[in-house]
Amino acid sequence: MLFQGILYALLFLLCAVVLAKVRSPGVRQTALLAASYALYVTWGPWFAIVLLASTGMNFLVGEYLRRKPSPAILFVGIVLNLALLFSFKYLPEIAALLPLSPLHRFSHLALPLGISFWTFQAMSYLFDLYRGDDLNPSFVEFALYMVFFPVTISGPICRMPDMLPQFRSQEPTAWNDIGRGLTRIATGVFMVQLAKLLGQGILGGDGISRGFDRVTHWSGPDVWCLALGYGLQLFLDFAGYSHIAIGAAKALGFTVPENFARPFQSTNPSVFWTRWHMSLSFWIRDYVFLPLAMLRRELWWRNLALVIAMVLFGLWHKASLLFLLWGCYHGVLLVLHRQLQQAQRKFDWEPGAMWTPLSWIVTLALINLGWIFFRANSLPQARRMLSAVLAPASYPSHILSGSLYLLVTTLAAGYGIVLLIAEALDRYAVEPQGAEARSGPGFLGQLARWRWFWIPPLYALALIFLLIVTLTRGPSTAQFMYNKF
C-alpha cells in the first residue's frame, strides 16, 4: 500500500487502536474495510469502483459455487476475472501497437493498482469453493479480503482459508506481534532504500538503471555485473516491500503469507522457486501446474505443464515477448533440473563434497542471467547482452569497464547484507516464538537472550522512529519496482 504519508500513518494507528481495544468482529472488520477503501480511493475513485465491482461479481459467483460446485459456474467466474484483468492490463499494450485500430483509444487506459494481486486472490477463492472448502464469508468479510490495505497493491497474495478465521478473531493484538511487525517494517524500509541506492548508483558510480538504459556496448563482465546487481536490486526492493506489508499486517495482529525465504541460497532452480515470490509461485503451482500435470501421467506432459506454468508466471508480469521468454527460460531450467535428478537416481550417483557449493554457484549464475530478459528495454538489447556473455572476445583484459568498478565492489557487500538480514529476521521476526526460540550461540544469540530487547517501551520508541522515517524518508508507492506489475 502507500507507506508514506500522514493518511496512511493515521489510519494504521486508528486500526491498531480498534484491534487492540474492540473485540466485536463486526466493528473490527468495518474499521479495517473503511480504512482500506479510504486509502485505495486516494489513487482515484475509478480504481475503487473497479475493485468494488470485482468484489461484488466474485462474491456473487462464490455464493452460487458454495451452493452448487458446478464446473460451468467456476468457468464463468474465471473468465470474468481474466476478462477484467485483460481489459486493464493487456488490452492497452495491444492497443498501443495498433494506432489505426478502433482499439487504440484504450491504449491510455489506467491500470488499477494491485489488480493482478487481488484478481488472483479472487480466483483462488473460487477455486477453493469449487474444491469443497467450507468457506462462508459475509460480503464485508469478502470485501475486506479483497482490499486488506497492507497487501492490496503488491501482495503477498493471500487465500481465504487463511484470512477468514483471522478476520473473525476477537483476540486483541499481542505485544509480541507488534514487536515483530515493527521489526519487519524497519527491515523493509532499510532494504528498499538499499535497492534505491543500488539502482541509482552509489557514491557517484553508475547504477543498475544507468547500466541498462545508457550503455550500448557491453563486455561479458559488464553484463554479469548488471545481471547480478539487478537481481540484488529487485530482491531488496520487492522483499523490502513484502517485509513492510507483512510487518504492517503483523502489527495489526494478522499473519499473511511469506514471500521470500533466502532465495539466493538455493542450490537448484526448483528450490529457488519455492523461495522467490512464494505467494505467486505457490498460486501457480496449486491452481495451474498441478491441475495440468494430473491430466496425463506421461513425463513429457508433466514437463510441458511445467513450462506452461512458468510462461504464465512470466506473462502475469507483463504481456511482452521478453517476459514470455523469461518464463520459457525458467521453465526449461526446471525441466533440465528434473532430468538431472532422474539421471542421478537412475545411475545411483552420490554427489561429492563439492557438489553443493558448485550447484549454488551455477544456480545463482543461471537465475541472474535470466534477469536480462526481465529487465532489458528491448529484445535486441537482451540479445546483445547475452551475446556479450557467450562471446569470449567480450571478456577484455581489464575485466570491467571503468564505470562499473564501484558497482562490482558493492555486490559482495550487498549479498552479505542480505544474508545478515535473513539471519536476523529468522531469529527475531519470522518464527512465532520470537527471539527466545532461536537464541543459539554468537552475538545474535546473546541479543535474543537479553529480555530487555523485547519490552513494550522499546516498541513505542520503534513506532515513533518508524513514523518519522515513513513521513520523511520512507518509500512511496512510486518507488517500488513491482508496483508496475
Language-model features and meaning:
Residues M1-K484:
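Membrane-embedded transmembrane alpha-helical bundles that form the catalytic cores
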